[in-house]
């Protein structure tokens, strides 16, 4: 996906997540690749290049019992059912970003409640750790929170317009 179209998609599909946060999270999770698949405790030899290839790969991983995450926001297969996703819908960019919003909002709510009167930025960082790992510590230890924070500070590059 061209990163220049991402802001409009994020606004339409995950409006409760600040655009900079959504962009940074997706940059780290999938590098804006809607067909990205991350295998927990493993790796693919190469990432799928098409929707059909992504679907076939994800179904094979599921059938083999692997734990994996898919799409722009790298939604984990263990969350599909509760988020109302299927393998097919999880690769739809808007559905994936909506799921990202749900998981991140749940994590933010937990972080805000877990730390008495936590500052919003502390809660956001804890929510990012939770998004990554399901808890408030692993994302810090593995450097995930730092990666997203660095990506959030990165200035998006402008793409030159084609001359007509």
Regions flagged by a language model, labelled:
Residues 27:
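Flexible glycine/serine/alanine-rich "lid" or loop that lines and gates the nucleotide-sugar donor pocket
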Residues 1-21, 31-36, 44, 48-73, ...:
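Non-catalytic cell-wall polysaccharide-engagement segments
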